[in-house]
Amino acid sequence: VGWTRNIRVAALVAVAALGLTACGGGDDKPAAAGKGGAPIVVASFNFTDSQILAEIYAQALEAKGYPVTRKLNLGSRELIYPSLKSGELQFIPEYQGSAIAAGFGKDPVKDAKGEHEQLAKLLEPSGVSLLDYAAAEDKNTYIVKADLAQSKGLATISDLKKLDKVVLAGGPECEKRLTCFKGLTDVYKLTNATFQTVQELGPRVQQLDSGGVTVIPVDSVSPQAGDSKYVALKDDLSMVPTENVVPAVTKKVLDERGADFAAAVNAVSAKLTTEGMRDLNKRVDSDGEKAADVAKDWLSQQGLV
């Protein structure tokens, strides 16, 4: 997720201009201990998967009686992390590998548990903690056309060596990233690979379908990653780090809200899967539904509301 999303990051603007300060909320009913006070400010990055996840967690908390204010579609970590540190934002669903690499400029370790520990240590000085990570991931996945995979025996990224020529299409940042084209040449040692800049996903898919390019990166939760027209190549040399979804929450909120709050959040994370998120992303991006509506449906289906 995160490493190819510069093309989706809006220009940074002043935090004050976005009005990130939490708004108060009234409730005539007496609140249970840990559930009163100012709303919890739940944020998201500016892409579909993040917005859906933020809605899922926000609605789950509201169903448990916690007041919530949403600040969605905000932009990049450059904006959001300072606001988490200051307490203006208090909760965001993160992606472990990207948070480590893009948020702190560090190399992620190669497993989800290790990443969780690594990210927790990096966030600790900012007064931010992590709750349980989910099985769901939103990471770079590399797809080829299914007929090409079948005819050439392509199942892994390493198998691209079988081809005379490999053309990878991606955003301009892909060319120099070890998780993208540079990884094909430096990690997988492909000498038959060339790069073609295609900024947006739609034209990239069109180029793949027409045979103009061989392979493209997509998000693992995108409809293309699960489409039978394509084959997602296994990252057999672990070029791309794990990107498990993990709620990042300010320590102040965790201390104030207590164990029941953490349990409510962890119950949501325990139900999230990559396949499930792919379906929700399709409903928003392809079918035109609203993130809040698909989040509500999912929570109901999972028995969480």
Name these PLM-found stretches.
Residues 48-67, 89, 182-186:
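Short, polar/charged alpha-helical segment
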Residues 24-27:
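Bacterial signal peptide processing site
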Residues 90, 166-236:
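Ligand-binding pocket segment of bilobal, Venus flytrap-like solute-binding proteins
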Residues 112-168, 251, 270-274:
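A conserved helix-loop-strand patch within extracytoplasmic ligand-binding domains
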Residues 103-111, 116-131, 210, 224-238:
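Ligand-binding "clamshell"
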Residues 19-22:
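C-terminal motif of bacterial Sec signal peptides marking the signal peptidase cleavage site
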Residues 33-55, 72-76, 173-175:
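Extracytoplasmic "Venus flytrap"
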Residues 48, 70-82, 194-206:
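Short helix-initiation/N-cap motifs at beta->coil->alpha
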